Amino acid sequence: MAMNLLNTASIAKEMQTKVTERMGDWFEAEFKAKANSASRRTRLIRSHGHTYTYARYQNTGQLSSNLKQVKKGDKIVVNAGTRANYTSGYHGMYFLVEKKGMQDVKTTLKKGANYANSMKL
């Protein structure tokens, strides 16, 4: 009687790497899109009877080009670089201190969980 022996450990390892790679790609693309939209977000200032607009965090546009996937062991981390990677003196992720930026991260993480559950391999 021949039994079909499946190497479940190697199958699980292969599935884990595929899911990790796909999730890393998805999060990188999603955060790049959010960073680009944040760089276009402007502020309105009303002063002396005039309305002025300016982009509060101008180097968040550089954030999308600085986002990279870094493989650490079995995991993939989406890294945004350090302050030295940006032209201004602050990091490109500072747009997250605003309410809209925090909402962007919450919705992205929620969408990420839904994407992982609906993923077909």
From Swiss-Prot:
Ranges in a coiled coil: none
GO BP: viral tail assembly
Keyword Magnesium: no
Main location: virion
Compartment list: Virion
Alphabetical UniProt keywords: Viral release from host cell, Viral tail assembly, Viral tail protein, Virion
One GO term describing the cellular component: virus tail
Summary of subunit composition and partner proteins: Homohexamer. Interacts with the tail tube protein.
Protein's name according to its UniProt entry: Probable tail terminator protein
Organism per entry: Lactococcus phage SK1 (Lactococcus lactis bacteriophage SK1)
